[in-house]
Amino acid sequence: MVLDSGTQVYEQAPPSPPASSPSQHHKLKPSNRNGPPLYPWPQSLAMPLALAVPSALQHQTMWQTFSKLHLEQRSHMKRSESTYSVNSTGRRGRGKAPLGRGCDPGGGTLRPAASLPHIAKIRKDVVSGSNKSPCMLVALRPTNMDQEREKFFQSHYAYNPQFEYQEPMPMSVLEKYQEASGQFMHQAVGIIKAVLEKFGTYENFEAATGGQLLTKCQIWSIVRRYMQKEGCVGEVVVQLSEDLLSQAVMMVENSRPTLAINLTGARQYWLEGMLRHEIGTHYLRGVNNSRQPWHSTEGRQQYGLRPANPTEEGLASLHSVLFRKQPFLWRAALLYYTIHQAAHMSFRQLFQDLEQYVQDEDVRWEYCVRAKRGQTDTSLPGCFSKDQVYLDGILRILRHRQTIDFQLLTSLGKVSYEDVEQLRPHGVLDKTRVPHFMKDLDRYRQQLEHIMTTNRLDEAELGRLLPD
């Protein structure tokens, strides 16, 4: 996800402490779900560009090397909306779910396949001893969220949380995203209702579209095959853990792009979509962007580029559901709807309003917290509207899907589809990379048509909303 209209960057993970103080460094909780360690390499090898698979049966992290190639530091691979926080506490806040309702028999809470990205948990080593401002996602995560969640649920949803935040608050960001849009509310509600008409409930939808829960061996196999398809074997470290609150976290660690995947929520179809989203879209466009004369803020200003966020997130969101039999845009639609409603409702009103679409209280809590980010007194109407960019970007791309040069759009890096023709003569296209799923453009465009049909999007209506 992208914070601003400039170059998309990944958030740097905090510097690793000295080797002599291992207790100070937060470790990924190892997984014991799948028996003995898959890979016999000890952590002492410190091989770059590896697939890290923690195991409870061995104290050191196991590494499976994709390649021995060394990756140069890529400053363009810092994503501002990705989290670097990996925590084991506060997973649910109301105790463990009973077996059969959100729990894996092997341990760990299963998160729905399309639930929200985690709001980064604040780390003491980030807050203290640093003069730098915290990243947006940390600054906007309430420091007392677990306590307020407990109060909220104990009140039977009658209490409006009173959130506290780490200082300083990013006021310029809050002001930028304080207004919600209603431009695409009809489309958002239409998508949500289409899902519920077909599946009955959100929970049924997740069970049907998420696919089977994957073992470590299956995850590693899928990731390895995907990296081979994209020709980026050896470039991205992949870590498997049971200690993530999110489904996946993209970060830069020791100057290397690192993708951490949550074992307890890794499902077949979600994992494939996540790889197209994170690697096939964000990562490859970032690599291509680093080769272009507009890779810097100054370069973007020189070429007069439009904000890249809607295109970037629209593409990534479309790629998440690409090739699914039923590619519903549920998450983007519900985020858009939730933020619009939050602008006019208190927290408890919003929570109750979402019940018509989502019965799972934990999922509703996540959506409400994201929509109310930055608010102290949530009894007041107000929203943090940034997450509306997903549906906004999706619909803009679908509106112009027949005229967009998708391969060139990817090759030019972090740019809007509106700037492609302007930049065509200036792009450095030598050795740029296009994701494998975009090379057959006929098939790719057919999938976009399938997405239009499945989500009941009307061509004429999009034309009226987004005229040329």
Swiss-Prot record:
Residues 1-39, 77-112 are annotated as: Disordered. Its cofactor is Zn(2+). It is found in: Cytoplasm, Cytoskeleton. Its main location: cytoplasm. GO terms for cellular component: cytoplasm; microtubule. The keyword Protease applies. GO terms for biological process: brain development; proteolysis. Belongs to the peptidase MATCAP family. Metalloprotease with an atypical HExxxH zinc-binding motif instead of HExxH, which interrupts the active site-containing helix without affecting the integrity of the catalytic site arrangement. This is Microtubule-associated tyrosine carboxypeptidase 1. It comes from Rattus norvegicus. The gene is Matcap1.
